[in-house]
Amino acid sequence: MVKKAIVTAMAVISLFTLMGCNNRAEVDTLSPAQAAELKPMPQSWRGVLPCADCEGIETSLFLEKDGTWVMNERYLGAREEPSSFASYGTWARTADKLVLTDSKGEKSYYRAKGDALEMLDREGNPIESQFNYTLEAAQSSLPMTPMTLRGMYFYMADAATFTDCATGKRFMVANNAELERSYLAARGHSEKPVLLSVEGHFTLEGNPDTGAPTKVLAPDTAGKFYPNQDCSSLGQ
């Protein structure tokens, strides 16, 4: 019980820090000092949301301090596979809402409700319904459900990085010999990043220098490289 109380208290503190306390409707612009004070810690929530043609959508949401999020949705009682889907993107806070923008540019909205998050409608307004639209604070691992990612892959000195097209964030890539060979073949003689489309998921691994948990891209497929293209290319 004590451990649960501590987890709940930390969730409340982190959530209030995340949402801020000003009254502006747009995303906050903070001074460096304010940004340091309001820097959020990774946070996660879980719950079962309503579903029109299944028993419910088991939803897990993970916010990261780098401004990104990952969501996993599992359709309970679904007859078709796959029944689990993952998505990711960037988050921002307004005066009273949490705004999630996914990798396709679509937005969704939530608001603080105690130590929980309440899902809002597509316009960012409360949903008038008898059904539950609340995600409770929880401690969970990042989902392993594959999702499509596109970004610039670069490999040098036994280390690979991936700069995601949707978020602009750069991640280390888990060791993958096949992907490394494909990159070397695609880049030719030039030592430069190559556009990559790959199915993968995020995981936490210890930083080789500090040992601190670091978010890493773990490829689930061989992926496909597009030489001489970048994130602005129509052919990505």
UniProtKB/Swiss-Prot annotation:
In the bilayer, the protein is annotated as: Lipid-anchor
Fetch the Pfam families from UniProt: NlpE, NlpE_C
The main location class comes to membrane
Which parts of the chain does the record assign to the membrane side Periplasmic? 21-236
**UniProt GO molecular function:** identical protein binding
- Taken from the UniProt record, the cysteine pairs bridged by disulfide bonds within this chain are C165-C231
Mind telling me which Gene3D superfamilies this protein's record contains? 2.40.128.300, 2.40.50.540
UniProtKB keywords: Cell adhesion, Cell outer membrane, Copper, Disulfide bond, Lipoprotein, Membrane, Palmitate, Signal
| Claim: NAD is one of the keywords in the record | no
Q: What does the UniProt entry say about where the protein is found?
A: Cell outer membrane
Q: Which GO terms describe its cellular component?
A: cell outer membrane
- Residues carrying the lipid (N-palmitoyl cysteine) are C21
Post-translation: what modifications?
Palmitoylated.
Q: Where is this region: N-terminal domain?
A: 21-100
Gene null: resulting phenotype? No visible phenotype. Slightly copper sensitive. Decreased numbers of stationary phase cells bind to hydrophobic surfaces, cellular adhesion has altered dynamic properties; no induction of cpxR when cells bind to hydrophobic surfaces.
Residue ranges for the region (C-terminal domain) are 126-236
Quaternary structure note: Probably exists as a monomer in vivo, can however form homodimers which swap domains.
Q: What is known of its domains?
A: The mature protein has 2 domains, the N-terminus (residues 21-100) and the C-terminus (residues 126-236) joined by a flexible linker; both domains form beta-barrels.
Q: What is this protein called?
A: Lipoprotein NlpE
